[in-house]
Design a protein with these regions (language model features):
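Hydrophobic beta-strand segments of well-ordered beta-sheets in folded domains
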Residues: 1, 73-75
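C-terminal domain-boundary segment and adjacent tail
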Residues: 27-43, 62-69, 76-130
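Catalytic domains of cell-wall/extracellular-matrix polysaccharide-remodeling enzymes
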Residues: 1-62, 97
Length: 130
């Protein structure tokens, strides 16, 4: 499940309620959005952190990847509209950055596993002994 705009709560003021318990019951995973860090492997599968790629360059995304690798964490990247940097919007995942990113993660010497969220979550659930 992808939380709309990363929001895990509904309502306002005193009536605000988390719908994470509903997501936990109905879905194998729930992904937030625009978080600043990657996921520890001892995590809440109903609230997976997702780091935003919008308006980022390859150098900053690569730094996030390397940090997650060094820490033994799972990095989920997310973005919105994909296009060229000439498009002026706050929610643009730059296609040139994506091309660099894809070249980097496809290179076998970098040893980066990419897969759908559900596949990686299943692997962690089976193999994480914590």
């Amino acid at each position: 499940f992808a939380y709309p705009c990363g929001n895990t709560y509904l309502g306002r003021d005193k009536k605000i309620k988390s719908y994470v318990p509903v997501v936990r019951k109905l879905f194998s995973t729930g992904r937030t959005f625009a978080d600043i860090s990657s996921n520890d492997l001892d995590l809440d599968f109903a609230r997976l952190s997702c780091v935003i790629m919008d308006n980022k360059d390859f150098k900053s995304i690569k730094s996030q990847i390397e940090h997650a690798r060094e820490q033994g964490k799972w990095l989920i990247l997310g973005g919105h509209e994909i296009g060229h940097k000439e498009i002026k919007t706050d929610y643009l995942t730059n296609i040139e950055m994506l091309e660099e990113l894809l070249d980097y993660i496809k290179n076998p010497t970098n040893k980066i596993w990419t897969a759908p969220v559900g596949e990686i979550a299943s692997y962690i659930k089976v193999n994480n002994k914590n």
